[in-house]
Swiss-Prot record:
CDD domains: Ribosomal_uL14. SUPFAM superfamilies: Ribosomal protein L14 (SSF50193). It holds the Pfam family Ribosomal_L14. Part of the 50S ribosomal subunit. PANTHER family: 50S/60S RIBOSOMAL PROTEIN L14/L23, LARGE RIBOSOMAL SUBUNIT PROTEIN UL14M. NCBIfam families: rplN_bact. The lineage of its organism: Eukaryota, Viridiplantae, Streptophyta, Embryophyta, Tracheophyta. This is Large ribosomal subunit protein uL14c. GO terms for cellular component: chloroplast; cytosolic large ribosomal subunit.
Length: 123
């Protein structure tokens, strides 16, 4: 569960390394916590030098991994090693061209098919 002030890793090659959540947008109105597939507004806390994204930029991101376990549609409980997000634009397309690490199958149902297709492993 991701809430404001939570630090997240970035799971793509957009140039950012760490994000801090500042607002949960989500899909179900006024949510307090973000889960896998929810959209957040975040600020970049650490970035690779000489890349398009810089420190202290406010961006949108979708959660792809959380340390808090969740039950999948088939009843399997999944928990990841870190909290991670992929930076997206206003249309929901990823800004990077690669996605690192595994992502959840539930992203496909939430119309983030581009992120799922870029991921090396889908759980």
């Amino acid at each position: 569960m991701i809430q404001p002030q939570t630090l997240l890793n970035v799971a793509d090659n957009s140039g950012a390394r760490k994000l801090m959540c500042i607002r949960v947008i989500g899909a179900a109105g006024n949510q307090r916590y973000a889960r896998i597939g929810d959209v957040i507004i975040a600020v970049i806390k650490d970035a690779v030098p000489k890349m398009p994204l810089e420190r202290s930029e406010v961006i949108r991101a979708v959660i792809v991994r959380t340390r808090k376990e969740f039950k999948g549609d088939d009843g399997i409980i999944i928990r990841y090693d870190d909290n991670a997000a992929v930076i997206i634009d206003q249309k929901g397309n990823p800004k990077g061209t690669r996605v690192f690490g595994a992502v959840a199958e539930e992203l496909r149902e939430l119309n983030f098919t581009k992120i799922v297709s870029l991921a090396p492993e889908v759980l």
